A protein has these predicted regions:
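Helical element adjacent to the flavin cofactor pocket in flavoenzyme catalytic cores
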Residues: 154-211
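Short beta-strand to alpha-helix junction loop
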Residues: 72-81, 106-115, 154-173, 292-297, ...
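N-terminal Rossmann-like FAD-binding beta1-loop-alpha1 element of flavoenzymes
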Residues: 18-45
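Flavin-dependent oxidoreductases
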Residues: 31, 191-280, 284-293, 304, ...
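C-terminal catalytic lobe of FAD-dependent flavoproteins
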Residues: 264, 273-274, 285-413, 420, ...
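Extreme N-terminal leader/targeting segments of oxidoreductases
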Residues: 1-20, 38
């Protein structure tokens, strides 16, 4: 089977203009490309960096949200609710790891405790009816390692954790196998719009397209301005996180959330599908859209807050630290808007819920394309896809004696922290969209 992926130093393909070009190959952009692959349209996915999922999509808390705390009636609330169901079903069919661990919003003082009933009411307005209030005794039963002083909690049983990396990989792989073209190392610097056609000036040459979708994440406002708009500004909000060793996994059984504030959901402690424990994120509004470094001050803040939430966690070994940037816009809702006269759709302001909502956003955008003059026709089913199992809740290759007997490479552990085998690395290098080494 043939598919088209181009990189720096390779020519862009010629031929007629694309019907649709999607700018940005994060989880939202790849989801849109996958959705469009179901239709008979010639589609390109354009990415400035050298790989998919290289921005916010690769550095987040990896939570599959229920949408219980979204603004009721907002577009985000609807798309998160729909996306959670759609992505959970898709993950089950493709092998993307998901664990339904539930979440606890823990109240540490009387003011936070008094806020929990309002959060329960908000969840019900968002059509989530499984939330329930817990007293301090029940909370201690569920999470015996919590720090002293917890007064109660709101339980959200259906909050889950998911793999944030294989999700866009699955979307992109299916899109490529269905005929979507992926152009990496392809930064858009100018857009010329004429009758019936956009011409994108990129770092690798021109790309012509009839319809344009802006899913550029942190840079969505810049792309929007190239089309003559100034409707939102993206402020990069850095979130630093600490990854603790797998030996810490038994210390926590739920996603432990603080009572949220206007700045975000705050610092959490969460298990991961890989068997580690996350602590973070910070919330730092910056000017630099490339500032993904961890800082001593930020990590010290996290350790201080983590010591109160789960004191024993701070004594565990740290596997890694990382930081990601979220696309804050100052608006409470997603900035998704179609411009029929320009044959253009802006998909901006997609914050931490973007992973959960990605498939629903893609379906919503496909619907908006009709308003910009594109007849998609009837959808077709995409070929099934199964990804390698990375979650610790399932049998990994290093545990599969029969698999190792057939292929000893799966018994050769290369990374002992994450238990990665030579066979898995070989498979990744032979995949439709292999990782790129320097």
């Amino acid at each position: 089977m043939t598919y088209t992926v181009t990189r720096a130093g390779q020519p862009l393909p010629g031929g007629p203009p694309y019907d649709v070009t999607v700018i940005g190959a994060g989880v939202v952009g790849t989801a849109i490309a996958r959705e469009l692959a179901r239709y008979r349209v010639r589609t390109a996915l354009v990415e400035a960096s050298d790989d998919i999922g290289n921005g916010t999509s690769k550095a987040n808390t990896a939570i599959l949200h229920t949408g219980f705390d979204a603004v009721p009636g907002s577009l985000e609330a609807r798309l998160v609710r729909e996306g959670q169901r759609t992505l959970a079903a898709y993950a089950a069919g493709t092998g993307i790891p998901v664990e339904r661990v539930g979440a606890l919003l823990v109240a540490w003082d009387e003011e936070q405790l008094a806020a929990l009933p309002d959060l329960l009411a908000k969840a019900e307005k968002n059509d989530y009816h499984a939330a329930r209030l817990l007293d301090a005794d029940r909370l201690a039963e569920l999470e015996p390692n919590l720090g002293p002083g917890a007064l109660g909690a709101l339980e959200i049983p259906d909050e889950s954790v998911i793999c944030p990396w294989t999700t866009p990989l699955a979307f992109a792989t299916q899109a490529l196998l269905a005929g979507v073209h992926l152009h990496l190392d392809c930064r858009v610097t100018h857009i010329g719009s004429g009758p019936g056609l956009h011409t994108l000036t990129t770092s690798r040459g021109p790309i012509r397209t009839r319809q344009l979708i802006n899913a550029a994440g942190l840079h969505a406002d810049e792309i929007d301005r190239l089309l003559g708009h100034d409707t939102f500004t993206v402020t990069p909000r850095r979130g630093q996180l600490i990854v603790f060793d797998k030996l810490a996994r038994d210390l926590v059984h739920h996603i432990l959330l603080p009572v949220p504030t206007a700045a975000g959901k705050g610092v959490l402690v969460a298990p991961t599908v890989f068997g580690n424990v996350l602590l973070g994120p910070t919330s730092e509004d910056l000017d630099d859209k490339t500032a993904t470094e961890s800082t001593g001050h930020g990590l010290a803040q996290l350790r201080e807050k983590g010591r109160r939430i789960l004191p024993r966690l701070i004594d565990e070994e740290v596997t890694a630290v990382y930081a990601g940037l979220r696309a804050a816009t100052g608006h409470e809702d997603y900035r998704i808007k179609e411009y029929p006269d320009l044959r253009y759709i802006a998909v901006g302001g997609i914050r931490s819920t973007g992973l959960t909502a990605s498939m629903a956003i893609a379906q919503h955008v496909a619907g908006l394309l009709a308003r910009t003059g594109l007849d998609l026709g009837a959808p077709t089913e995409l070929p099934p896809l199964t990804l390698p199992g990375l979650g610790e809740a399932t049998d990994r290759p290093y545990l599969d004696a029969a698999l190792i007997a057939r292929d000893p490479a799966y018994g050769t552990v290369v990374c002992h922290c994450e238990r990665v085998t030579a066979g898995e690395i070989r498979d990744a290098l032979d995949s439709v969209l292999p990782p790129r080494s320097a």
